[in-house]
Curated annotation (Swiss-Prot):
One Pfam family per UniProt: PK_Tyr_Ser-Thr
Residues annotated as glycosylated: 126, 250, 353, 408, 414, 437, 469, 522, 566, 616
Family according to the record: Belongs to the protein kinase superfamily. Tyr protein kinase family. EGF receptor subfamily.
Top-level taxon in the UniProt lineage: Eukaryota
Domain Protein kinase: 707-964
Protein name in UniProt: Receptor tyrosine-protein kinase erbB-3
Length: 1339
């Protein structure tokens, strides 16, 4: 550290001892506000400075040093460390201003409106006396204000000071010019910055040398040498107790932002409690109590209360409290700090009805006789009587001139206190001088002079002041504060009889008569001394309290020989003059006075005591009985009349309540109709050009004044979503809406104009997309949609996963696919499809949201940043991640992830993986793992959505068809393991929402618009609850179906080695050769060896696995027992035995208006056979046994369909078909990616004991009749090719019993597959397996 740094530290340590005692005991003295005006000569100025600032450390105000001589010893100023106002040094002759400990000038008041230090004209033109040095060696902080130092002929080194290091405000004005020249240079250790020539005069730098990490001051150049934020003027360490001065407040040596509050929060009781360590803010110091001449306002020591508060005395503490009603009037005084210098004719009317003078009162000769210079006329002496209402003066009272005919100051006869918070000249609070005609003071009510000195001089006729005991009036020693001289001698006053009244005590008096006594010798009555009180005789009778006579209440009866009362109230009388009502003496008994329960009537008894009348008396009484009532009717109200009156009254009340209810309901219905009118009505946008067609846009163009945002619901990649209200222009209704604010962060695009894409988004209307109510162009685009209080489907499935059943999940998948198909028809690419962007309109209807938003932004804003946390990488297709390519087929990929979220009840995809790792995993062929509740059929639909080749992925039309088919038999495709009681049907789904949530949704005004639809859905839910009655075993998923991957990973690898050697791992247990389960890369349910899709074929990995399983089983001929409790097992066999029924007419589809698919639960006994099916084959020929040979099984597995009835023709247009109904062939399903593959070998069923083969045959082959196919499938948009057909599978319901065990039949080996064909990242493999060409051959 350099030498200057060493000196800085030494300087700091030198003052540390005094700095540590900053908050414990500080000598605080008041400042002045005289400016350049002075009274008296240089000696008087010096004496004033000495008395004000001797041993002073903190100046509460301004330090003004003006017109001081050259021989003045100012060493008493060396203890001043802080000035709260400004420092003024002007017109002085001394050579050095010794303020070596001054550290901080706060600048709460600034000179000339902008300067905290003002130094000017400190020299004598007629001599060599002049100011040569400002010894401010410790000054390091000016909190407010600038610096002005000019025209000081001998003052040196001011231009060497770095004032920017001292001044805190960066733009403060600094003027330093025209000062002394030919000054000696700074000492070399000061490096050009000094207050004087010596090495001890170096400037201490505490800001410009600091490291950038420091916010304020520092004690060294290193980053760890920063001062505390509450420090001002530097520090010796980093703590708040190491500050040389405090920026805000000093609390016992520690710098704090505020003093301890009067109330503190108790964490145990959760309440605000009084703080036992409360302190008050007195200037920059926290004190335990304010000075006696200040008042407490909350936690501040103030000179006067604010205008809306009044001063009260609480437990000896003067406090400011809000006035109850009109406050005592406080008026501004005169003198320093006021706009008036004296009381004169121009301002005396402002003192009318004043009870308190805030400041001072000055009576000067220019005020009484007038001021011709300022054109102020003379004062009318009678107007001085306005001061008779004054009770307190907070400053000083200065009377230097008084009207000649007024011989005392009796206009101040009610003045009780002179506060002395601001003092005159040399510290006077009461100054009376040069009043030649005044004979007495007349301050008969004055009780206290809180601070300051008393100066009474040169009043030639003044008497009575000699007798006053000033110690009763003054706080502190009276000898040092009294300066009474040059008045009329005491002997002359006594000779003329101008002495105190004999009734006055030894305390003296203010003038002649018993009313001017400072205190009384005997008693006083209303301020006048008396010899005795009228206790036993005289009028009015009185009682005595602390030597004061107080009158009894007028209702007291005067007593002879004893006291009449013992207090001033009506309850303190010994005897009443008229009547007594309880303890009080009254002029008359109460008659009709309103009480808590009605009018009160009383009568006087024989002893003049007031007694209550009967409760039925309404006009008074003369006795306690009912017959004593005055004005009572002869016939009282009978009981029947009372009953009639009560009945009529209640009827009127009910009519009023009923009318109010009907009025409220009518207004509510009216508001609902208005809301429906605004929400359902679209707007036609007129063409801009005659050649353009009119565009029917359902959305509106809103004005910003019609929308009001309430709270933020969330934020995403493209903007922020707010909950708000729409107030249509000219209407009073408030419609709850969702407002999505889209902003262009680059600022290159504005949304002032309505584009074609905006109109295209506004024209979309579908049951399964969130309709856009309107948009508001501007600097940011605001999209307005209907507010759906049920929230997103993601939050819903997470909260209600225990109550959701397979029917709801599959129907939601259908509705999402239909909504996306509608967007595809209108060439709208979503780009951000995820479960969070699917909203729940009702418990059974969902809608896709946030579509078309990305196209509203410029191309650069749609580029993907893998590091951006909000970019939906996990939902995006590979071509979108790598190339930013977004198509309807990339939305299909996102749809697969959305369905995966739905089937995992809101799990996060690829949990635990960084976003940058996901593209590499997808390229390696790894995909999300099979959800636990999904069969292989549902999972394979997801896998097809995640194909690398986008052309191989299914379309939304095919996806809607596939999920519609699966929704007919939900337990067959989704197995949700959930505990159910014996009396609860396992297939009956509970409500996805609680009763309270449904009620809250119904209370939302926007949900009332779909009231009719919700009623239909409630009826539908009731039908579903009774219709879905399957055996308990159909909902039970075997525990053997578990993923081999860690649940936290959230994906499954798809590039694994083939399973060709899996069948070789066998073990011999109990003499039987049993197969060990092959190492699967995705869960395979037990009891399901083939695909459960209705097309009857298997995909690539499945076919490969089943071929090897078939080969192993055909060699070993094992008979492993398998459970038969899985509905998928029965439905698989049933698909081989059930004929495909013709397509039902569109009018018979079991689907409600919201896309909710009804499960096919109406069972029929039989149905007509169809050529090419296996319905006519007997059980013995279809179900293989152990004795059957392999040739028969092989022949069965290679059996082909003979033929099919002709398919219905393809509809001519989408309007003929409608997107709700997608066409399928009568015999072949247009399911996703189906192909005609080999039928599988059936599995032999070995019934358990007690079950006959006939019963089993009847149970397993039960199917519907022809009439049951009416609601089987929804019509699809186009017929598939013949090569892509597959057989139809139907759900069925058993009679309530089932075989407990099943055994696998011997399976014949199918066509072998090469290992190279089974790679999941080979598009040719998937294309050949899932989507065969037209010339593919069947086997």
């Amino acid at each position: 550290m350099s030498a200057i740094g060493t000196l800085q530290v030494l300087g700091f340590l030198l003052s540390l001892a005094r700095g540590s005692e900053m908050g414990n005991s500080q000598a605080v003295c008041p400042g002045t506000l005289n400016g350049l005006s002075v009274t008296g000569d240089a000696d008087n100025q010096y004496q004033t400075l000495y008395k004000l600032y001797e041993k002073c450390e903190v100046v509460m105000g301004n330090l003004e040093i003006v017109l001081t001589g050259h021989n003045a010893d100012l060493s008493f100023l060396q203890w001043i460390r802080e000035v709260t106002g400004y420092v003024l040094v002007a017109m002085n002759e001394f050579s050095v201003l010794p303020l070596p400990n001054l550290r901080v000038v706060r600048g709460t008041q600034v000179y000339d409106g902008k300067f905290a230090i003002f130094v000017m004209l400190n020299y004598n033109t007629n001599s060599s006396h002049a100011l040569r040095q400002l010894r401010f060696t410790q000054l390091t902080e000016i909190l407010l204000g600038g610096v002005y130092i000019e025209k000081n002929d001998k003052l040196c080194h001011m231009d060497t000071i770095d004032w920017r290091d001292i001044v805190r405000v960066p733009d403060a004005e600094i003027v330093v010019k025209n000062n002394g020249g030919n000054c000696p240079p700074c000492h070399e250790v000061c490096k050009g910055r000094c207050w004087g020539p010596g090495p001890e005069d170096c400037q201490i730098l505490t800001k410009t040398i600091c490291a950038p990490q420091c916010n304020g001051r520092c004690f060294g150049p290193n980053p760890n040498q920063c001062c505390h934020d509450e420090c001002a003027g530097g520090c010796s360490g980093p703590q708040d107790t190491d500050c040389f001065a405090c920026r805000h407040f000093n609390d016992s040596g520690a710098c704090v932002p505020r003093c301890p509050a009067p109330l503190v929060y108790n964490k145990l009781t959760f309440q605000l409690e009084p703080n036992p360590h409360i302190k008050y803010q007195y200037g920059g110091v926290c004190v335990a109590s304010c000075p006696h001449n200040f008042v407490v306002d909350q936690t501040f020591c103030v000179r006067a209360c604010p205008a809306d508060k009044m001063e009260v005395d609480k437990n000896g503490l003067k406090m400011c409290e809000p006035c109850r009603g009109l406050c005592p009037k406080a008026c501004e005084g005169t003198g320093s700090g006021s706009r008036y210098q004296t009381v004169d004719s121009s301002n005396i009317d402002g003192f009318v009805n004043c009870t308190k003078i805030l400041g001072n009162l000055d009576f000067l000769i220019t005020g009484l006789n007038g001021d011709p210079w300022h054109k102020i006329p003379a004062l009318d002496p009678e107007k001085l009587n306005v001061f008779r209402t004054v009770r307190e003066i907070t400053g000083y009272l200065n009377i230097q001139s008084w009207p000649p005919h007024m011989h005392n100051f009796s206009v101040f006869s009610n003045l009780t206190t002179i506060g002395g918070r601001s003092l005159y000249n040399r510290g006077f609070s009461l100054l009376i001088m040069k009043n030649l005609n005044v004979t007495s003071l007349g301050f008969r009510s004055l009780k206290e002079i809180s601070a300051g000195r008393v100066y009474i001089s040169a009043n030639q006729q003044l008497c009575y002041h000699h007798s006053l005991n000033w110690t009763r009036l003054l706080r502190g020693p009276a000898e040092e504060r009294l300066d009474i001289k040059y008045n009329r001698p005491l002997g002359e006053c006594v000779a003329e009889g101008k002495v105190c009244d004999p009734l006055c005590s030894s305390g003296g008096c203010w003038g002649p008569g018993p009313g001017q006594c400072l205190s009384c010798r005997n008693y006083s009555r209303e301020g006048v001394c008396v010899t005795h009180c009228n206790v036993l005789q005289g009028e009015p009778r009185e009682f005595v309290h602390e030597a004061h006579c107080f009158s009894c209440h007028p209702e007291c009866q005067p007593m002879e020989g004893t006291s009449t009362c013992n207090g001033s109230g009506s309850d303190a009388c010994a005897r009443c003059a008229h009547f007594r009502d309880g303890p009080h003496c009254v002029n008359s008994c109460p008659h009709g006075i309103l009480g808590a329960k009605g009018p009160i009537y009383k009568y006087p008894d024989a002893q003049n005591e007031c007694r209550p009348c009967h409760e039925n008396c309404t006009q008074g009484c003369k006795g306690p009985e009912l017959q004593d009532c005055l004005g009572q009717a002869e016939v009282l109200m009978s009981k029947p009349h009372l009953v009639i009156a009560v009945t009529v009254g209640l009827t009127v009340i009910f009519l009023i309540l009923g009318g109010s209810f009907l009025y409220w309901r009518g207004r509510r219905i009216q508001n609902k109709r208005a809301m429906r009118r605004y929400l359902e009505r679209g707007e036609s946008i007129e063409p801009l050009d005659p050649s353009e067609k009119a565009n029917k846009v359902l959305a509106r163009i809103f004005k910003e004044t019609e929308l009001r945002k309430l709270k933020v619901l969330g934020s995403g990649v493209f903007g922020t979503v707010h909950k708000g209200i729409w107030i249509p222009e000219g209407e009073s209704i408030k419609i709850p809406v969702c407002i999505k604010v889209i902003e262009d962060k680059s600022g290159r695009q504005s949304f002032q104009a309505v584009t074609d894409h905006m109109l295209a988004v506004g024209s979309l209307d579908h049951a399964h997309i969130v309709r856009l109510l309107g948009l508001c162009p501007g600097s940011s685009l605001q999209l307005v949609t209907q507010y759906l209080p049920l929230g997103s489907l993601l939050d819903h499935v997470r909260q209600h996963r225990e109550t959701l059943g397979p029917q709801l999940l599959l129907n939601w998948g259908v509705q999402i696919a239909k909504g996306m198909y509608y967007l595809e028809e209108h060439s709208m690419v979503h780009r951000d499809l995820a479960l969070r962007n699917v909203m729940l309109k009702s418990p059974s209807q969902v809608q896709v949201a946030d579509f078309g938003v990305a196209d509203l932004l410029p191309p650069d804003d749609k580029q993907l940043l893998h590091s951006e946390a909000k970019t939906p990488i996990k939902w995006m297709a590979l071509e979108s991640i790598h190339f930013g390519k977004y198509t309807h087929q990339s939305d299909v990929w996102s749809y697969g992830v959305t369905v995966w979220e739905l089937m995992t009840f809101g799990a996060e995809p690829y949990a635990g993986l960084r976003l940058a790792e996901i593209p590499d995993l997808l390229e390696k062929g790894e995909r999300l793992a099979q959800p636990q509740i999904c069969t292989i059929d549902v999972y394979m639909v997801m896998v097809k959505c995640w194909m690398i080749d986008e052309n191989i992925r299914p379309t939304f039309k095919e996806l809607a068809n596939e999920f519609t088919r699966m929704a007919r038999d939900p337990p067959r495709y989704l197995v949700i393991k959930r505990a159910s009681g014996p009396g609860i049907p396992p297939a009956a789904e509970p409500s996805a929402l609680s009763t309270k949530e449904l009620q809250d949704a119904e209370l939302e005004p926007d949900l009332d618009l779909d009231l009719d639809v919700e009623v239909e859905e409630e009826g539908l839910a009731t039908t579903l609850g009774s219709a879905l009655s399957l055996p308990t075993g159909t909902l039970t998923r075997p525990r053997g179906s578990q993923s081999l991957l860690s649940p936290s990973s959230g994906y499954m690898p798809m590039n694994q080695s083939n399973l060709g050697e899996a069948c070789l791992d066998s073990a011999v247990l109990g003499g039987r050769e049993q197969f060990s389960r092959p190492i699967s890369l995705h869960p395979i349910p037990r009891g399901r060896q083939t695909s459960e899709s209705s097309e009857g074929h298997v995909t690539g990995s499945e076919a490969e696995l089943q071929e090897r399983v078939s080969m192993c089983r055909s060699r070993s001929r094992s008979r492993s027992p398998r459970p038969r409790g899985d509905s998928a097992y029965h439905s698989q066999r049933h698909s081989l035995l059930t004929p495909v029924t013709p397509l039902s007419p569109p009018g018979l589809e079991e689907e409600d208006g919201n896309g909710y698919v009804m499960p096919d639960t109406h069972l029929r006994g039989t149905s007509s056979s169809r050529e090419g099916t296996l319905s006519s084959v007997g059980l013995s020929s279809v179900l293989g046994t152990e004795e059957e040979d392999e040739d028969e099984e092989y022949e069965y597995m290679n059996r082909k369909r003979r033929g099919s009835p002709a398919r219905p023709p393809r509809p001519g247009s989408l309007e003929e078909l409608g997107y709700e109904y997608m066409d399928v062939g009568s015999d072949l399903s247009a399911s996703l990616g189906s192909t005609q593959s080999c039928p599988l070998h059936p599995m032999a069923i070995v019934p358990s004991a007690g079950t006959t083969p006939d019963e089993d045959y009847e149970y397993m082959n039960r199917r519907r009749g022809a009439g049951g196919s009416g609601g089987d499938y929804a019509a699809m948009g186009a017929c598939p090719a013949a090569e892509q057909g597959y057989e139809e599978m139907r759900a069925f319901q058993g009679p309530g019993h089932q075989a407990p065990h099943v055994r696998y039949a011997r399976l014949k080996t199918l066509r072998s597959l090469e290992a190279t064909d089974s790679a999941f990242d080979n598009p040719d493999y998937w294309h050949s397996r899932l989507f065969p060409k037209a010339n593919a051959q069947r086997i």
